[in-house]
Protein backbone atom coordinates (compact mmCIF):
# COMPACT_ATOMS: atom_id res chain seq x y z
CA UNK A 1 0.00 0.00 0.00
CA UNK A 2 2.74 2.42 0.96
CA UNK A 3 4.62 1.40 -2.17
CA UNK A 4 1.71 2.53 -4.36
CA UNK A 5 1.67 5.92 -2.63
CA UNK A 6 5.43 6.26 -3.02
CA UNK A 7 5.30 5.24 -6.68
CA UNK A 8 2.53 7.73 -7.46
CA UNK A 9 4.00 10.68 -5.55
CA UNK A 10 7.64 10.13 -6.49
CA UNK A 11 6.88 9.63 -10.17
CA UNK A 12 4.67 12.73 -10.17
CA UNK A 13 7.66 14.75 -8.99
CA UNK A 14 10.25 13.09 -11.23
CA UNK A 15 8.14 13.48 -14.37
CA UNK A 16 8.47 17.26 -13.99
CA UNK A 17 12.22 16.88 -14.41
CA UNK A 18 11.83 14.89 -17.61
CA UNK A 19 9.33 17.44 -18.97
CA UNK A 20 11.90 20.17 -18.38
CA UNK A 21 14.59 18.11 -20.10
CA UNK A 22 12.27 17.45 -23.06
CA UNK A 23 11.56 21.16 -23.53
CA UNK A 24 15.29 21.88 -23.38
CA UNK A 25 16.09 19.16 -25.92
CA UNK A 26 13.34 20.40 -28.21
CA UNK A 27 14.85 23.88 -28.15
CA UNK A 28 18.26 22.51 -29.19
CA UNK A 29 17.12 20.35 -32.11
CA UNK A 30 16.54 21.52 -35.70
CA UNK A 31 13.02 22.56 -36.65
CA UNK A 32 12.98 20.60 -39.93
CA UNK A 33 11.75 17.09 -39.16
CA UNK A 34 14.26 15.14 -41.27
CA UNK A 35 17.14 17.07 -39.72
CA UNK A 36 15.63 16.56 -36.27
CA UNK A 37 15.61 12.77 -36.66
CA UNK A 38 19.24 12.93 -37.78
CA UNK A 39 20.07 15.10 -34.76
CA UNK A 40 18.27 12.67 -32.44
CA UNK A 41 20.32 9.76 -33.77
CA UNK A 42 23.56 11.71 -33.44
CA UNK A 43 22.65 12.33 -29.80
CA UNK A 44 20.88 9.03 -29.16
CA UNK A 45 22.58 8.44 -25.82
CA UNK A 46 20.87 11.57 -24.50
CA UNK A 47 17.48 11.13 -26.18
CA UNK A 48 17.29 7.36 -25.71
CA UNK A 49 18.36 7.65 -22.07
CA UNK A 50 15.81 10.37 -21.45
CA UNK A 51 12.95 8.34 -22.93
CA UNK A 52 13.96 5.18 -21.08
CA UNK A 53 14.05 7.08 -17.79
CA UNK A 54 10.67 8.67 -18.52
CA UNK A 55 9.28 5.26 -19.50
CA UNK A 56 10.27 3.83 -16.10
CA UNK A 57 8.82 6.85 -14.29
CA UNK A 58 5.52 6.46 -16.16
CA UNK A 59 5.46 2.75 -15.31
CA UNK A 60 5.79 3.68 -11.62
CA UNK A 61 2.93 6.14 -11.96
CA UNK A 62 0.77 3.58 -13.73
CA UNK A 63 1.38 0.95 -11.05
CA UNK A 64 0.29 3.43 -8.37
CA UNK A 65 -2.82 4.43 -10.33
CA UNK A 66 -3.86 0.83 -11.02
CA UNK A 67 -3.43 -0.06 -7.35
CA UNK A 68 -5.64 2.87 -6.30
CA UNK A 69 -8.26 1.88 -8.90
CA UNK A 70 -8.37 -1.69 -7.58
CA UNK A 71 -8.12 -0.73 -3.90
CA UNK A 72 -10.94 1.82 -4.01
CA UNK A 73 -12.91 0.38 -6.95
CA UNK A 74 -12.79 3.96 -8.20
CA UNK A 75 -13.99 5.15 -11.60
CA UNK A 76 -11.67 8.16 -11.41
CA UNK A 77 -8.60 6.02 -10.89
CA UNK A 78 -9.79 3.57 -13.56
CA UNK A 79 -9.89 6.42 -16.09
CA UNK A 80 -6.50 7.68 -14.89
CA UNK A 81 -5.03 4.17 -15.19
CA UNK A 82 -6.41 3.77 -18.71
CA UNK A 83 -4.85 7.07 -19.72
CA UNK A 84 -1.51 5.99 -18.27
CA UNK A 85 -1.63 2.65 -20.08
CA UNK A 86 -2.23 4.46 -23.38
CA UNK A 87 0.64 6.86 -22.67
CA UNK A 88 2.98 3.93 -22.01
CA UNK A 89 2.51 2.79 -25.62
CA UNK A 90 4.28 5.96 -26.74
CA UNK A 91 7.73 4.98 -25.50
CA UNK A 92 8.30 1.71 -27.41
CA UNK A 93 7.25 3.58 -30.57
CA UNK A 94 9.91 6.24 -30.00
CA UNK A 95 12.64 3.92 -28.74
CA UNK A 96 12.09 1.41 -31.52
CA UNK A 97 11.02 3.73 -34.32
CA UNK A 98 13.58 6.54 -34.23
CA UNK A 99 16.98 4.89 -33.89
CA UNK A 100 18.78 4.22 -37.20
CA UNK A 101 15.59 4.00 -39.26
CA UNK A 102 14.74 5.57 -42.64
CA UNK A 103 12.96 8.91 -42.49
CA UNK A 104 9.65 7.38 -43.62
CA UNK A 105 9.64 4.87 -40.75
CA UNK A 106 10.80 7.43 -38.20
CA UNK A 107 8.12 9.85 -39.36
CA UNK A 108 5.44 7.16 -39.12
CA UNK A 109 6.62 6.20 -35.62
CA UNK A 110 6.60 9.87 -34.66
CA UNK A 111 3.02 10.38 -35.82
CA UNK A 112 1.88 7.22 -34.04
CA UNK A 113 3.71 8.20 -30.84
CA UNK A 114 2.35 11.75 -30.90
CA UNK A 115 -1.24 10.63 -31.50
CA UNK A 116 -1.00 7.99 -28.78
CA UNK A 117 0.51 10.45 -26.31
CA UNK A 118 -2.16 13.09 -26.98
CA UNK A 119 -5.06 10.65 -26.58
CA UNK A 120 -3.49 9.10 -23.48
CA UNK A 121 -3.02 12.47 -21.83
CA UNK A 122 -6.58 13.49 -22.65
CA UNK A 123 -7.93 10.40 -20.88
CA UNK A 124 -5.47 10.81 -17.98
CA UNK A 125 -6.35 14.46 -17.43
CA UNK A 126 -10.10 13.81 -17.65
CA UNK A 127 -9.60 11.16 -14.98
CA UNK A 128 -7.84 13.70 -12.78
CA UNK A 129 -10.67 16.19 -13.32
CA UNK A 130 -13.18 13.54 -12.25
CA UNK A 131 -11.03 12.68 -9.23
CA UNK A 132 -10.69 16.24 -7.98
CA UNK A 133 -14.34 16.99 -8.71
CA UNK A 134 -15.38 14.65 -5.90
CA UNK A 135 -12.30 14.36 -3.71
CA UNK A 136 -12.47 15.67 -0.15
CA UNK A 137 -8.75 15.22 0.52
CA UNK A 138 -7.76 18.82 -0.17
CA UNK A 139 -8.87 22.14 1.23
CA UNK A 140 -11.41 23.83 -1.03
CA UNK A 141 -8.98 26.31 -2.59
CA UNK A 142 -6.46 23.61 -3.56
CA UNK A 143 -9.23 21.41 -4.91
CA UNK A 144 -10.42 24.29 -7.10
CA UNK A 145 -6.86 24.86 -8.33
CA UNK A 146 -6.56 21.16 -9.21
CA UNK A 147 -9.93 21.24 -10.97
CA UNK A 148 -8.97 24.35 -12.93
CA UNK A 149 -5.61 22.94 -14.01
CA UNK A 150 -7.00 19.55 -15.00
CA UNK A 151 -9.91 21.22 -16.79
CA UNK A 152 -7.74 23.62 -18.80
CA UNK A 153 -5.18 20.97 -19.75
CA UNK A 154 -7.91 18.46 -20.64
CA UNK A 155 -9.51 21.04 -22.92
CA UNK A 156 -6.15 21.82 -24.52
CA UNK A 157 -5.53 18.15 -25.33
CA UNK A 158 -9.09 17.86 -26.63
CA UNK A 159 -8.32 20.73 -29.01
CA UNK A 160 -5.24 18.80 -30.15
CA UNK A 161 -7.38 15.74 -30.82
CA UNK A 162 -9.84 17.85 -32.83
CA UNK A 163 -7.00 19.59 -34.67
CA UNK A 164 -7.40 23.16 -33.44
CA UNK A 165 -4.04 22.94 -31.63
CA UNK A 166 -0.86 21.14 -32.62
CA UNK A 167 1.56 19.13 -30.50
CA UNK A 168 3.97 22.04 -30.79
CA UNK A 169 1.46 24.20 -28.95
CA UNK A 170 1.67 21.86 -25.95
CA UNK A 171 4.70 23.78 -24.69
CA UNK A 172 2.32 26.59 -23.77
CA UNK A 173 0.47 24.45 -21.22
CA UNK A 174 3.59 22.69 -19.91
CA UNK A 175 3.80 24.89 -16.75
CA UNK A 176 0.18 24.02 -15.93
CA UNK A 177 0.90 20.31 -16.35
CA UNK A 178 4.00 20.69 -14.15
CA UNK A 179 1.95 22.27 -11.38
CA UNK A 180 -0.78 19.64 -11.71
CA UNK A 181 1.78 16.85 -11.33
CA UNK A 182 3.03 18.46 -8.11
CA UNK A 183 -0.55 18.56 -6.81
CA UNK A 184 -0.88 14.89 -7.76
CA UNK A 185 2.27 14.14 -5.77
CA UNK A 186 0.81 15.93 -2.74
CA UNK A 187 -2.43 13.98 -3.15
CA UNK A 188 -0.53 10.69 -3.08
CA UNK A 189 1.32 11.76 0.05
CA UNK A 190 -1.80 13.02 1.83
CA UNK A 191 -4.36 10.35 0.95
CA UNK A 192 -5.01 7.52 3.41
CA UNK A 193 -5.34 4.10 1.86
CA UNK A 194 -7.86 3.10 4.53
CA UNK A 195 -10.32 5.63 3.12
CA UNK A 196 -12.80 4.44 0.51
CA UNK A 197 -14.13 6.78 -2.16
CA UNK A 198 -17.08 4.93 -3.60
CA UNK A 199 -18.38 8.16 -5.14
CA UNK A 200 -15.27 8.51 -7.28
What are these regions (language model features)?
Residues 1-200:
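Hydrophobic, aromatic-enriched alpha-helical segments typical of multi-pass transmembrane helices
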